[in-house]
């Protein structure tokens, strides 16, 4: 039996972002500028809003021995968990820039999606914003990015 999977999302203009989302975007852009990306020249920044109001950022860190580097999303999520292990994530925002400036928007890689899903399972689902220069993709439940993800129930 064939089935169809749909992912609900919204598109927002920059003017439709809340003041908090604009702050997260600015922090993610600042993080992206700190990325170490000498090979791809693709700089990604992530900003994580914690339930305690803290904002944690991360950037991608490349390595000549690919895939030994890490993505911005995992950098931010792991740092948040290491510093505040019992504080839930309330929101994740991702941006990217390259040599030409802002890119339209990017979606997390498979490894990042798995970490995002594990984080949501650990606490609660949270929204994810994929911010481009002109448009932001808003997904209310981050787990929708990995509908058939692996979890601890299989262990």
Description of each model-found segment:
Residues 1-26:
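Short, compositionally biased leader-like segments
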Residues 43-50:
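Short beta-strand scaffold segments in enzyme catalytic cores
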Residues 37-40:
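Short loop/turn motifs at secondary-structure junctions and domain boundaries
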Residues 26-33:
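Short Pro/Gly-enriched beta-strand edge/turn motifs at strand-loop
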Residues 57-155:
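Zn2+-dependent cytidine deaminase-like catalytic core
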Residues 33-34, 91:
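Context-gated lysine
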């Amino acid at each position: 039996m064939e089935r169809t999977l749909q992912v609900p999302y919204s598109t927002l203009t920059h003017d439709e972002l809340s003041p908090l989302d604009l702050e997260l975007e600015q922090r993610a852009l600042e993080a992206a500028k700190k990325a170490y990306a000498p090979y791809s020249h693709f700089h990604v920044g992530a900003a994580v809003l914690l339930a305690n109001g803290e904002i944690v950022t991360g950037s991608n860190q490349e390595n000549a021995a690919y895939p030994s580097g890490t993505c911005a999303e995992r950098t931010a999520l792991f740092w948040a968990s290491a510093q505040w292990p019992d504080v839930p994530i309330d929101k994740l925002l991702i941006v990217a820039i390259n040599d030409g400036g802002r890119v339209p928007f990017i979606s997390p890689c498979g490894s990042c999606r798995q970490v995002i899903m594990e984080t949501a399972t650990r606490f609660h689902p949270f929204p994810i914003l994929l911010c481009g220069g002109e448009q932001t993709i808003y997904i209310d439940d981050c787990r929708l990015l990995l509908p058939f993800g692996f979890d601890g129930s299989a262990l």
